Amino acid sequence: MKINKYNALRFWEECYGSKQYAEDFHGNLMCKDGYGNNNFSVNYYGQEIYCGWNIHLILPSACGGTNAKSNLLCTNIATNEEAGDRITFWIGESLYQVKRIYGTRDHEIIRIE
């Protein structure tokens, strides 16, 4: 999938339907209207919550990952930046690792600590 705003919003709808808000794999909030916006936030009970999002490659391209839909996730921009192009990474106090799904060519992100 070519990653651009149009395709990203279609991918959001495939993943979350008509929902305006969702959480990424780390639990960070995303707002559909915040695609690609580093400064997008909402006020929730008087607290500003950053919820811009973009597309994350589960298996980074540097490790052989592609833009196939099975290798993509919607993630909060902060989550994506923390994960970077690594297959083992920390976000806060959580350690994650990209693992191959047994019997397939697909990968997933697993919290290991």
Regions flagged by a language model, labelled:
Residues 2-52, 76:
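Short cysteine-rich loop/turn motifs with clustered Cys
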Residues 9, 29, 57-59, 72-73, ...:
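Generic detector of leucine side chains in alpha-helical contexts
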Residues 27-31, 75-78, 92-99:
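Solvent-exposed, non-transmembrane amphipathic alpha-helical segments
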Residues 34-75, 83-88:
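Histidine-centered nuclease catalytic patch
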Residues 63-70, 81-113:
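Polybasic, low-complexity binding patches
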